[in-house]
């Protein structure tokens, strides 16, 4: 007897259920006793809907249909952004995970697995945006311009509404997208224990798709139940055009194969995974350490510290992998932009998700951050529920001194197990600039590299050891000098030493006098700098008005001056 099948078919961004008409026809042509559910989704161009809310509504919809339908199997399918929602729907149906809790819109109703989760046979992703979207060289010029303009308007809209448009919530590195990736990996890892979460996944991707790359499937290819099928002569949108033309029928055949082929047949006839995405998966890695550089820095030193940590771990029989990727040179002016800082946080969390995929047996992640590298983790811990690190080292921190570490240290399970924050004697970079933001009550960045963290002082946390290391002699990079590498490695591998302060660098008793004095009122430094910067335009105006300098000369000098300031601000 034929199985009674329910297919949940989800449209993509700016699309509507009726745009899936050809897809529905192709499904019904090869599956008997099938019901195709095509719900309308809040994915219009101007939508500001939370994707978690969309998935919550889908859960309720499937729950009701399951109660009345008596289905023998379920197939989840989606196009583009709809494929992301199909994956999230499956994750939510399989229940919450303690290390990657679902968002509040889903957590209250997803403590345990849904009864129908075990009946999900496969997911079929049509041009699924498994790694989100980003503007890069793969895009056509027209699409890149369209997305660039859209991002500008979306950011302006956020300033007015304080809500991100839906399209920006599924970009590469965004919280919803990254958390989905981590939730998926943990769900697949625990599928054998929970009895749900192991459905087949088939990705269909057009051969001329300029929005989704075959290499965007890292999270999926690390499992044995993922298969990849090329759709000939198809782009990101035209993959749905399964009309009566030759190309349309070829597309329909690929979809029908994805729906009906057995796992064994898919393994034979799908594209070889190592060619689609040559991911080097290492099952031997026990722990992973991130070593991330900061502003005004290319990060060449990160490999050296990471190597010291790997060697220390090897000496005690533990295998460490290292993540020392660079996000490029990041000058002072870009650092002052919250938009630029947010992009770097998204970069970090993209690397975090990739590391979970690449090292599936790793049980602990550690972090060593300097300058902006400290901000990246602090912000990631606030924005991403799936972010967990065991031991954390901050040097030259640009995080506010009142940052809430207790909530991370005391959460269950802990988001952070232990942390060291090195405070330097003469870190004028932090004392004069990020510290000024904290002095003025502006959140997000601050002077912990100069002040220390309030909650990490003795008595301010559960640890008997001081987590603020006061004071390392030197300036902004004092704690990452070679003399301190061994101490950093010892802490990451072994934890806080019982016999002393974990520092190989020279230590002092207080800040250097002038740094400490000027840091008492850092806005004075800014006012002095602004006065100096304003003096040149003032002199030019004086020359024009009193000494009758030529207008073209004054204009040229002013343009050259502003350009120089911009260049210097991006390099220092």
Task: Label every model-predicted segment.
Residues 541-560:
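Hydrophobic alpha-helical transmembrane segments
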Residues 90-272, 382-383, 391-522:
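Helical cap/lid subdomain of alpha/beta-hydrolase-fold lipid enzymes
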Residues 563-572:
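Membrane-helix interfacial anchor on the cytosolic side
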Residues 77-82, 86, 368-373, 377:
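Gly/Ala-rich beta-loop-alpha elbow adjacent to hydrolase catalytic centers
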Residues 2-74, 281-363:
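Active-site catalytic motif of lipid deacylating hydrolases and related acyltransferases
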């Amino acid at each position: 007897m034929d199985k009674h099948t329910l297919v949940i078919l989800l449209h993509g961004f700016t699309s509507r259920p009726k745009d899936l008409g050809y897809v529905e026809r192709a499904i019904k042509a090869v599956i008997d006793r099938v019901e195709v559910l095509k719900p309308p989704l809040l994915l219009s161009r101007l939508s500001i809907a939370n994707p978690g809310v969309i998935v919550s509504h889908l859960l309720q919809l499937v729950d009701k249909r399951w109660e009345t339908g008596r289905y023998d199997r379920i197939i989840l399918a989606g196009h583009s952004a709809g494929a992301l929602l199909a994956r999230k729907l499956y994750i939510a149906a399989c229940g919450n995970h303690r290390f990657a809790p679902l968002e509040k819109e889903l957590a209250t109703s997803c403590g345990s697995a849904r009864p129908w989760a075990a009946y999900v046979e496969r997911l079929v992703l049509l041009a699924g945006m498994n790694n989100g979207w980003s503007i890069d060289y793969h895009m056509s010029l027209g699409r890149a311009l369209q997305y660039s303009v859209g991002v500008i308007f979306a950011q302006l809209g956020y300033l007015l509404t304080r809500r991100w448009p839906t399209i920006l919530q599924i970009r590469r590195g965004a919280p919803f997208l990254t958390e989905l990736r981590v939730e998926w990996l943990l769900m697949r890892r625990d599928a054998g224990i929970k009895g749900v979460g192991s459905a087949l996944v088939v990705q269909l991707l057009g051969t001329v798709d300029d929005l989704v790359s075959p290499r965007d499937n890292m999270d999926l290819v690390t499992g044995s139940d993922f298969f990849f099928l090329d759709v000939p002569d198809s782009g990101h949108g035209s993959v749905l055009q399964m009309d009566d033309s030759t190309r349309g029928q070829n597309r329909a055949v690929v979809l029908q194969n994805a729906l009906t082929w057995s796992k064994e047949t898919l393994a034979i006839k799908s594209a070889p995974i190592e060619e689609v995405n040559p991911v080097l998966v290492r099952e031997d890695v026990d722990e992973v350490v991130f070593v991330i550089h900061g502003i005004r820095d290319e990060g060449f030193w990160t490999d050296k510290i990471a190597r010291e940590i790997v060697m220390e771990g090897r000496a005690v029989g533990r295998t460490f992998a290292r993540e020392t990727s660079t996000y490029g040179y990041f000058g002072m002016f870009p650092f002052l932009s919250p938009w630029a800082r947010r992009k770097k946080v998204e970069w970090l969390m993209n690397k975090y998700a990739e590391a979970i995929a690449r090292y599936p047996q790793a049980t602990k992640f550690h972090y060593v951050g300097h300058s902006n590298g400290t901000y990246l983790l602090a912000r990631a811990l606030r924005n991403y529920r799936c972010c967990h690190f065991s031991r954390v080292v901050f040097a030259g921190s640009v995080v506010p001194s009142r940052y809430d570490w207790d909530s991370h240290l005391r959460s269950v399970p802990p988001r952070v197990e232990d942390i060291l924050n090195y405070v330097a004697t003469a870190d004028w970079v932090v004392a004069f600039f990020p510290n000024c933001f904290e002095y003025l009550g502006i959140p997000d960045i601050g002077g912990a590299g100069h002040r220390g963290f309030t909650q990490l002082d003795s008595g301010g946390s559960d640890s008997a050891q001081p987590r603020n290391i006061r004071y390392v002699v030197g300036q902004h990079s004092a704690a990452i000098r070679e003399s301190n590498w061994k101490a950093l490695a010892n802490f990451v591998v072994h934890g806080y030493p019982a016999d002393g302060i974990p520092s190989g660098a020279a230590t002092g008793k207080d800040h250097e006098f002038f740094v400490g004095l000027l840091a008492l009122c850092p806005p004075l430094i800014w006012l002095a700098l602004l006065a100096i910067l304003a003096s040149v335009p003032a002199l030019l105006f004086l020359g024009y008005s009193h000494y009758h300098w030529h207008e073209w000369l004054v204009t040229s000098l002013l343009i050259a001056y502003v350009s120089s300031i911009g260049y210097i601000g991006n390099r220092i």
